[in-house]
Amino acid sequence: MRVEVFYVPNCPHHPTAVSQLKAVLRAEGIPVEIHEVSVTNTKAAQELRFRGSPTVKINGRDIAGESQEPESFALACRIYAGAKEVGLPPIEMMQSAVREARKGETT
């Protein structure tokens, strides 16, 4: 399983997202390294399909799913609709994505 967190420098939510993701992985018994990727320019944002900071991907898939909005990639904060703290992916979203990825690896 490949786990990545993409972020812009000085993102206030990046450290918390990584910490929560580590806790989810630990609780699920998955000893995997989290690759943290700093996105520092617009070209990189476009190449990485970066939808804002922080973005969590597992096996290359955005845990928030694919957006129905027109694609716009930029150096910006990310908003997670329905989250208690809108700048962080909900823990439940992380748990679901980790479980789904693990299930896909065992089938």
Language model features: what each stretch is:
Residues V5, P9, A44, G82:
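Conserved short-loop catalytic and cofactor-binding motifs
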Residues K43-R49:
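Acidic pyrophosphate-coordinating catalytic loop
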Residues P31-T42:
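Thiol-based oxidoreductase modules, predominantly thioredoxin-like and allied folds used
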Residues E105-T107:
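Short acidic DE-rich linear segments
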Residues M1-A23, A27-E28:
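Local sequence-structure signature of Cys/Sec-based thiol-disulfide redox active-site neighborhoods
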Residues R61-R102:
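Non-catalytic, surface beta->alpha helical segment in thiol-disulfide oxidoreductase systems
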Residues R49-K57, E69, F73-A74:
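Structural micro-motif
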